[in-house]
Structure formats: structure tokens, C-alpha cells
């Protein structure tokens, strides 16, 4: 095992410290030799920038430049201030280049009450053209005024219109022509000059003078008295109709209540033990007794055009009292409906019958067997379409047809069966042409 000298570690430490000192000196000399560009701005302020603190007081700068302008030492309050091209430039507003900017500056500097429109050419007066026309007419103290007088008064009292585009005169003419508040007065023959006069309509004078009509508005809608009375009558009819409907509903409710009481007294309830309420309350109650079946079918009456108007109205609406004994067929079901014996019902109308005359040139033709009704019930249950076809065939047989006429009967009926031509006429007369000459 070898023994190292004690002086070796001390020498190594001294040399290490010397190396560190030389390295630090080299870095300082390098940083001093390299000149960094001051125009390169750090973007770290973007992360800390906020609109809320942008209006806070600026920190005073420690030094000024040669021009005497102040430079910000802290973070700039806007990206424009951090631009190298903007460094050293005064941040003051420049000269306005448009008339709108000058108008805004004048409006911002002067209050609205202190603006003199007669001498200020930059501010437009806050009045509508209709108001300007009304002011000119009032200032003239005359019943009528010309268009040129209106122009002169506006230019004399408002400096803005003296320097503005003359298109405002077109707006004045349009307001005079289209606004209901102004009316034109024709010039008389003995009056000198050209053109007509203008004046304020007395109907709208108060509203226009008070400033209620600064803009063109249509007159209020006036309802004619005849239409107003018609609307009042319609509203009264609707009220009467609603009252009549309420009375009808109350009467029907009373009728149903009376019927339920009568059926309960007789010991028969068609809707179960819960009565009429079991229909609406279907979830909690169930019918214990089914409804009675219909034991007969009501005959369908034909809507024949031969019925009179009174009979048709009787068919359309039920008149008289109901015969509950017939409806519920008490004789079959075995129930006693003595309470309904006093009720009467109108008997059904008998079918319309008509004697048909089937005589052609003195020869009688018997009606087919199917034309005769089998009974009263059969006649009542006949369909209206079959009855109309019967009338059509009857009217056709009453009038002789022409020689070359093709009709319903000639296409569907057999001539030999109707007239028995095989027995009465020879074989050569069975043709249509010879038949016409024979008749």
C-alpha cells in the first residue's frame, strides 16, 4: 500500500479555484465585448399584460433621450408602444384628416346646450326635416309660405346647411309632398310669382307644433260607423250564442238526471251501479252490466226530391217527445215503463207512391213484378238510388223515342221482351228502321 503526499490535495484545490476564477473573468470579458441590440424587446410583458391595469399610472423614467421625450422603463401598456418603430416617437394625437373626426371633436368639447347652430358649420341640427319646415312656417307668421322661403329660413338659421351638400333640399320637397301634415295651396291668378304655397294642415297642427310628429307617420285608422255597428252586432250575437249553448247544456243535463232517477226507481240501470259517471271514470270503475243490444234497426228513409220542404225539415230534426218504451223495447226485455205511457212519438212517414201510367199509343204495358212493393216495411227500406232509377225508366216510357236515338233503355233492355214484337209483327219488322215506320 502506497502513501500519498499530503501537499497533493492542497495543490489540486488551489488549481481548481484558480480555474474557476479565470473562467468567470473570461465570461465577463465576453459579455463586455459583445454589444446586444437594445431594439430587441422582451415579449415577457405579453403574459403579464391586462386591459384592467393598462390605464394605471406610468412609472417615471430614470433618464431622458436627446429629444426630451420620455421613455418608459417598465412594461409597455400596449403592443404599439413596444414596437421598435414607435420608440422615441411622441404619443400625441395627430391632425384629423376627415370632417367626421372634426365633428366628433367639436361635439366632445362642447355641450349640446351651448352649440350655436347659427354659426357652427360642423354640427348638424338635431331636428327632422318636417320639424324644420314647421319652424320655418311658424317663423314667417303667415298662413302660407313658398318653398324658396323655407330654404332661405333654414340656411339663415342653420350654418350647417349653408356648407352641406344641397341634396337636403330634395328631402325638404319630399317631406312637403308625402307628409300628411302639410298641404299645398294653389296660387291665385292675381298673385305674382310662380309655384304654389304650402301650409300646415289644421288637423295635425297641434301635434306637429308640440313635437309629436318629428317623423312622418300615417294618420290613425278610423273605423266607419257602419263597420263599427256591424262589429258590435257580431259581438252581441256571439254572446247570445254562448248563453244559448249554456242553456241547452243545462237542459240536457237535467234530462239525463231525470232519466237516471226514473231508471233507478224501476230497478234497471243501463250503465251499472255507478250511473252515468262510470263512463268518464273508466280507470277506477268497471261496468258490471253490459249495455242493452239494439233489437231493431231504424229504417233509412230515402231523400227523394218529391218530398216537400216541410217534410224534409221534419226528417232533419226530431220533434215531439221521445217514446222510451219503443226505444228500449220493454215488452221484450220484460221491464215496466209505465212512466213513459203518456209520451207520444210521431209515426214514420209513409213512402212516396206514385201511379205509373205505362201506355204507349193506346197500348198498355204491365208494370214488372219487381216494381210492386212487397209491403210497407219493404217500401220504407228501399234505397233512394233504386227509386231514382225507377222514375227515370218511367219518364222514358211515357215519351216516344226518336228513330236514331241511343238511350239507356235501348242499350240495356230487350225490345222484344217489352213489346212482344215476335207475336204482333212479322219477322221483317223486327228491325229498328222498320219499327219506326210502323209506329
From Swiss-Prot:
This protein's UniProt keywords: Activator, Cilium biogenesis/degradation, DNA-binding, Nucleus, Transcription, Transcription regulation
Location of the region described as Disordered in the Swiss-Prot/TrEMBL record: 273-293
GO biological process, one term: cilium assembly
A single GO molecular function term of this UniProt record: DNA binding
Keyword Nucleus attached: yes
Tissues showing expression: Expressed in two independent areas of stage 10-11 embryos; in the dorsal blastopore lip (Spemann organizer) and shortly after in the ectodermal cells of the animal cap. As development proceeds, cells of the animal cap contribute to the epidermis and show a spotty pattern, which suggests expression in ciliated epidermal cells. Distribution of these cells is uniform in the trunk area of the embryo but more random in the head, being practically absent in the cement gland and olfactory placode. The spotted pattern becomes more dispersed as embryos grow in size.
DNA-binding interval(s): 124-218
Localization annotation: Nucleus
Gene3D superfamilies named in the record: Winged helix-like DNA-binding domain superfamily/Winged helix DNA-binding domain (1.10.10.10)
PROSITE patterns: FORK_HEAD_1 (PS00657), FORK_HEAD_2 (PS00658), FORK_HEAD_3 (PS50039)
The organism's place on the tree of life at top rank: Eukaryota
CDD domains from the UniProt entry: FH_FOXJ1 (cd20023)
Subcellular location, principal: nucleus
Family to which the UniProt record says this protein belongs: Belongs to the FOXJ1 family.
PANTHER family: FORKHEAD BOX PROTEIN J1
Protein name: Forkhead box protein J1-A
Originating organism: Xenopus laevis
Amino acid at each position: 500500500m502506497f502513501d500519498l503526499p499530503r501537499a497533493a490535495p492542497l495543490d489540486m484545490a488551489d488549481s481548481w479555484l484558480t480555474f474557476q476564477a479565470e473562467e468567470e473573468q473570461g465570461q465577463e470579458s465576453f459579455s463586455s465585448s459583445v454589444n446586444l441590440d437594445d431594439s430587441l424587446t422582451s415579449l415577457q410583458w405579453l403574459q403579464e399584460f391586462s386591459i384592467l391595469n393598462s390605464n394605471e399610472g406610468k412609472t417615471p423614467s430614470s433618464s431622458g433621450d436627446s429629444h426630451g421625450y420620455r421613455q418608459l422603463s417598465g412594461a409597455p401598456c400596449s403592443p404599439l408602444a413596444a414596437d421598435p418603430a414607435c420608440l422615441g416617437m411622441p404619443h400625441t394625437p395627430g391632425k384629423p384628416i376627415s370632417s367626421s373626426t372634426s365633428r366628433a371633436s367639436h361635439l366632445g368639447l362642447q355641450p349640446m346646450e351651448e352649440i350655436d347652430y347659427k354659426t357652427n358649420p360642423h354640427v348638424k341640427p338635431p331636428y327632422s326635416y318636417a320639424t324644420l319646415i314647421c319652424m320655418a312656417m311658424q317663423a314667417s307668421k303667415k298662413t302660407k309660405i313658398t318653398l324658396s322661403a323655407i330654404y332661405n329660413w333654414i340656411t339663415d338659421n342653420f350654418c350647417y346647411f349653408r356648407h352641406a351638400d344641397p341634396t337636403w333640399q330634395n328631402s325638404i320637397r319630399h317631406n312637403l309632398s308625402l307628409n300628411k301634415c302639410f298641404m299645398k295651396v294653389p296660387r291665385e291668378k292675381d298673385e305674382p310669382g310662380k309655384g304654389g304655397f304650402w301650409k300646415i294642415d289644421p288637423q295635425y297642427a297641434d301635434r306637429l307644433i308640440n313635437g309629436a310628429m318629428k317623423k312622418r307617420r300615417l294618420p290613425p285608422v278610423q273605423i266607419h260607423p257602419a263597420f263599427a255597428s256591424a262589429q258590435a252586432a257580431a259581438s252581441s250575437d256571439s254572446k247570445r250564442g254562448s248563453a244559448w249553448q249554456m242553456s241547452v247544456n243545462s237542459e240536457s243535463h237535467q234530462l239525463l238526471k231525470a232519466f237516471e232517477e226514473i231508471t233507478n226507481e224501476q230497478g234497471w240501470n243501463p250503465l251499472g251501479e255507478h250511473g252515468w259517471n262510470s263512463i268518464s271514470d273508466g280507470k277506477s270503475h268497471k261496468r258490471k252490466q253490459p249495455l242493452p243490444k239494439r233489437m231493431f234497426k231504424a229504417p233509412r228513409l230515402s231523400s227523394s226530391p218529391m218530398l216537400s220542404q216541410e217534410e224534409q225539415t221534419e226528417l232533419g230534426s226530431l220533434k215531439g217527445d221521445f217514446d222510451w218504451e219503443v226505444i228500449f223495447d220493454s215488452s221484450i226485455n220484460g221491464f215496466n215503463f209505465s212512466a213513459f205511457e203518456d209520451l207520444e212519438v210521431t209515426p214514420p212517414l209513409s213512402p212516396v207512391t206514385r201511379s205509373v201510367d205505362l201506355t204507349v199509343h193506346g197500348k198498355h204495358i204491365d208494370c214488372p213484378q219487381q216494381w210492386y212493393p212487397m209491403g210497407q216495411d219493404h217500401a220504407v227500406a228501399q234505397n233512394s238510388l233504386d227509386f231514382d232509377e225507377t222514375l227515370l225508366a218511367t219518364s222514358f216510357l211515357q215519351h216516344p223515342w226518336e228513330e236514331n236515338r241511343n238511350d239507356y233503355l235501348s242499350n240495356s233492355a230487350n225490345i222484344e221482351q217489352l213489346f212482344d214484337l215476335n207475336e204482333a209483327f212479322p219477322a221483317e219488322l223486327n228491325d229498328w228502321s222498320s219499327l219506326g215506320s210502323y209506329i
